[in-house]
Amino acid sequence: GASGPYASRPAYDNVGQAASGWLSMFHAGADPKVAGPAVSDAVAGLYAALGVLGALVERAQTGRGRKVEVSMLEAMIAMACEPLAAMMATGQAPSLYGRAAMSQSYVVTCRDQRRIGLHLSSPEKFWRGLVAAIERPDLLAAYPTRAERVERYPALAATLAEVFAGQDRDYWEPRLERHDVPFMPERRLDELADDPQVQHQGVFYEQVHPRHGALRAAHRPVRYDGDNRSDFRPPPDLGEHTAEVLREAGLSAQDLDILQQAGVV
């Protein structure tokens, strides 16, 4: 934040995760490791964008501008709304796998060492669909209610792990789909471009940089009237747009010549 006891301290992604409680929910055991993308950086940026948009809407209505501020700490706390609400209701900090148990989410490794993500949520039909897909009707009697599946999550997870380890992923996928189980095979980032849904939605595109050739990037995730195309210029080289920015700031051609001769730009 702009003030307070931490205001003068440097902050990066992992600092934001540690300060906001996120880091405690993503590691366990005696050998904790940092994993995943820079969540704090992305979340703070998203909330900043929302704040700017809100200020622009207000300005259009009132003619008054706003100073928009976002701290990484507050942004990450806001994004943790679900576990935070649970903690406030129960007085207990969520365990590492608390959300997985409540949402009935599982990651299972198949015989070929490829993984599947399952999320059964609340509807009973998804649990029954999973039981039918893996041909284990005995589990209906062993775990008759959702409350029992939540309470005995570790035991159920171990059973599912044993079942899925018996066949390759290609065996399980059509069975899960046929029984309408919420699942997806675990994708690596380098596999995304080959995913049929990703291809259908036209997620990735290529642009040509004048010096560095073809570059691949992802379109924006928002569609306007069905269109998600991004009209972005290629990433600039160091200093490529400095003169353009300075001209927009009001510097004259003569001012730019002086700066260029002095080696400033």
Q: What residue ranges belong to the model's regions?
A:
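Active-site-adjacent "lid/gating" segments in soluble enzymes
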Residues: 1-115, 120
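Helix N-cap/coil-helix junction residues
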Residues: 136, 198, 251-252, 264
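Aromatic-enriched alpha-helical interface/lid elements that frame and gate functional surfaces
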Residues: 104-179, 183
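A glycine-rich dinucleotide-binding beta-alpha-beta segment and adjacent secondary-structure elements
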Residues: 178-230
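Flexible, small-/acidic-enriched active-site or ligand-binding loops
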Residues: 211-258
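Short linear loop/turn motifs
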Residues: 141-152, 157, 187-194, 255-265
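Conserved active-site and cofactor/substrate-binding residues in soluble primary-metabolism enzymes
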Residues: 17, 34, 43-47, 121-125, ...
